[in-house]
Amino acid sequence: MKLYSFWRSLATYRVRIAMNLKGIKPDEVIDINLMKGQQREESFKKVNPMMAIPALVDGEGPALFESLAIMEYLDETHPNPPLLPKDPKGRARVRGLAQIVACDSHPLVVPRVREHLAHEYKFDEPTVMKWAQHWHGAALKALDTHLADKATG
């Protein structure tokens, strides 16, 4: 099992935490330095054409990509301990919370998104920060509201 990783990647942290909880140790961790643009190198594009990490290669076949999909794969192939509750509603709730983080908040810290805002829309750094803070704030407020219920939070 090979994990393509970068130490500053929140998405990779999600996968590494899941692996740690399950006692899974990858055979190899391959560092893809996003700050140096290594995700754009042809060798990595063959692993993940989206040029994003994490990516996981487990045996034969194509690499797995996107942290939530990788975590579901790990949970299905290594069922104990489970990452998700047993009941369908509980699983859906956890997936919804994870998607707020992965889909609504996390992309705002990804360099390629911030670079796109700067180059395509001519946002200066304070404007990018203001934009990101607005959407982060909305996502965190939603998470706080969802997690306020002590029975399910």
Residue map of PLM features:
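GST-like domain detector, emphasizing the conserved glutathione-binding G-site
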Residues: 1-128
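Surface-exposed helix-capping loop/turn segments at secondary-structure junctions
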Residues: 80, 145-153
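Short, structured loop/turn "capping" segments at alpha-beta junctions
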Residues: 105-110, 142, 149-150
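Amphipathic alpha-helical packing segments from all-alpha helical-bundle domains
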Residues: 129-148
